[in-house]
Design a protein with these regions (language model features):
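Glycine-rich P-loop/Walker A and Walker A-like loops and their local beta1-loop-alpha1 context
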Residues: 1-4, 9-18
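Conserved H-loop
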Residues: 11, 76-82, 84-91
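ABC ATPase nucleotide-binding domains
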Residues: 40, 118-158
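Conserved P-loop NTPase "ATPase switch" module shared by AAA+ and STAND
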Residues: 47-60
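Helical segment within the ABC ATPase nucleotide-binding domain
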Residues: 62-75, 87
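H-loop (His-switch) and adjacent beta-strand-loop-beta switch element
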Residues: 93-108
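Short acidic-hydrophobic catalytic motif
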Residues: 110-113
């Protein structure tokens, strides 16, 4: 798989087999279940300009994930985040959704998240902030869908 060097990706995976990961053999892969300090330390001396995370963010809080992304930006490192957590899709520019090794959806984050029925069928749903903002449009409290909780909160208070 080829990735654009200027784009951060989230790959939402559902029931993929081991061969799926062979397409990343040319990339540096950071494995799963790492804690923040360990992950940060590893990235501070990272030699490559592209890193693949395989469920590496599972134990991280939202603020820790943002901190990791800031560190990656500072070092000019782009990422591919392989995950089953729909919330992580909001941290990248581009999302590819796989089900059993078959690509189901692909596009910029907002385009993919507009496919709520397909995502729910695959067991994902929508990120909380997206779902909340959609629900609030039904009550005419908001007039658009939000992809960032800070922006949603700011607009609600104004």
């Amino acid at each position: 798989m080829m990735f654009d060097d200027n784009v951060n990706y989230t790959l939402l995976v559902n029931n993929v087999n081991k061969e799926f990961f062979n397409q990343f053999k040319d990339y540096s892969i950071i494995g799963n279940n790492m804690f923040f300090d360990e992950l940060k330390e590893k990235l501070e001396m990272f030699p490559s300009k592209r890193v693949v995370f395989n469920e590496s963010w599972f134990n991280l809080s939202g603020n820790e994930k943002k901190s990791i992304i800031e560190l990656l930006k500072k070092q000019n490192i782009n990422f591919v985040n392989i995950t089953s957590n729909i919330e992580d899709s909001l941290l990248s520019n581009y999302v590819i959704v796989y089900d059993e090794d078959k690509k189901v959806l692909e596009g910029n984050t907002e385009v993919v998240l507009r496919n709520e029925k397909i995502l729910k069928k695959l067991g994902y749903g929508l990120p909380f902030v997206v779902d909340l903002s959609i629900q609030l449009t039904y009550y005419d409290i908001l007039d658009k869908v939000y992809y960032n909780m800070d922006k949603l909160t700011e607009d609600l208070w104004n």
